[in-house]
Regions:
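Local beta-strand N-terminus motif with an aromatic residue
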Residues: 5, 30, 59, 254-255
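N-terminal Rossmann-like FAD-binding beta1-loop-alpha1 element of flavoenzymes
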Residues: 5-33
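Conserved Rossmann-like nucleotide-cofactor binding loop
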Residues: 15, 38-39, 264
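Glycine-rich FAD pyrophosphate-binding loop
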Residues: 24-49
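Mid-domain catalytic core of redox enzymes
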Residues: 26, 232-320
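A general beta-strand register signal
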Residues: 49, 92, 229, 245-246
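Dinucleotide-binding Rossmann-like beta1-alpha1 core, especially the glycine-rich loop
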Residues: 51-128
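Active-site/ligand-binding neighborhood in enzyme catalytic cores
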Residues: 96, 113-239, 256, 260
Length: 320
């Protein structure tokens, strides 16, 4: 017997959980979330190891200027379930800690590299070559100059994306990268001060307990149990007949499929699929990573106590 569902949501990560909650909120009862793992949350999950350390495996710090999203976050953990931190992130390079963003704190670099970076900034701003940008590398060079790009932004982004910046476009940047305020930089140099307050997440909230995964675990628990099916992986999607077949052989007919799966995986499950789309889907680029957690017993060392996280752009270590 084929189960019939109006809204079938593929994936029980943040997007899938959000879709389900919104459907419930709108009074829609005819939906089902399919999640291949035996837990909800996707890559925004947190795990507790045998020693009691909590590890976030993907999504970590979040920030928002959307009232609805903020309301959902408060719904997840309540007003008292959060800690608020002032972001203090640092870069470990040239054998020293330098406050992030680098361009606002280049006076903390060795003298020769500081001069190279500052001169590169001024030259880049004077050139104003934004009309001739072809890729992410061009954008970095045009925005920050040769010095900052070569010492930090190019090697760091290659580590993060595992792909050369000259082969990436730059329309995704938005608020993710701090742009240049040359007058602010000059003031920091004159006053010899650290500048760490840039950005939309210069203060951020983090769950008191359970890591980032606590948010999505809580929100998933607000979905009616009958409306989320864990340990249920999609095997095939018959797009002509609107039928999903799961790995355990269950068939589900849907009116609307809301997919939160990676595009390449989604395309591999759809049949029939036009050959042109199928071949293009195999060319989609993506990166993967290994998450390594090291738990240290004892108090936080003084020189790390007020640092929220660190960036490692240099090639003398594999992590970033």
């Amino acid at each position: 017997m084929i189960k019939q569902i109006k809204y079938l949501v593929a994936g029980g990560g943040p997007c899938g959980i959000g879709a389900a909650l919104r459907l419930q909120e709108l009074g829609e009862n005819d939906f089902l979330v399919l999640e291949k793992e035996d837990y909800a949350g996707g890559l925004a999950t947190s795990f507790v190891d045998a020693q009691g350390f909590t590890w976030d495996v993907g999504g970590h710090v979040q920030f928002s200027h959307y009232k609805y999203f903020d309301k959902i976050m408060e719904k997840a953990l309540g007003k008292t379930g959060w800690l608020t931190h002032e972001r203090a992130s640092f870069i470990w390079m040239k054998d020293r800690f330098i406050p992030y963003p680098l361009q606002n704190n280049i006076h903390r670099l060795p003298e020769d590299i500081f001069k190279e970076c500052f001169e590169g900034l001024e030259k880049a701003l004077a050139n104003n070559s934004s009309n001739s940008l072809k890729n992410f590398k061009d954008w970095l060079l045009a925005s920050f100059g040769e010095g900052i790009a070569s010492h930090f932004l190019l090697p760091y982004n290659y580590k993060v994306w595992a792909y050369h910046p000259e082969k990436m476009q730059y329309g995704w940047i938005g608020e993710r990268v701090s742009v240049v305020d040359i007058e602010r930089i000059k003031k920091n140099i004159e006053e010899d001060k650290d500048d760490i307050s840039w950005g939309p997440n210069n203060t951020f909230q983090f769950p008191k307990f359970g890591g980032t995964g606590a948010i999505w675990k809580s929100l998933a628990s607000m979905i009616k149990p009958s409306k989320i099916s864990l340990a249920t992986e999609i095997d095939t999607i018959d797009s002509d007949n609107n039928i999903v077949t799961t790995k355990n052989g269950e068939k589900i007919e849907y009116q609307y499929l809301l997919s939160t799966m990676p595009l390449d995986i989604l395309c591999s499950k759809i049949s029939p699929m036009p050959e042109a789309i199928s071949s293009k889907s195999k060319e989609l680029l993506y990166s993967s990573t290994h998450i390594v957690g090291i738990g240290v017993e004892g108090p936080t060392p003084k020189h790390l106590a007020k640092k929220c996280w660190l960036y490692f752009p240099e090639n003398n270590c594999p992590f970033y």
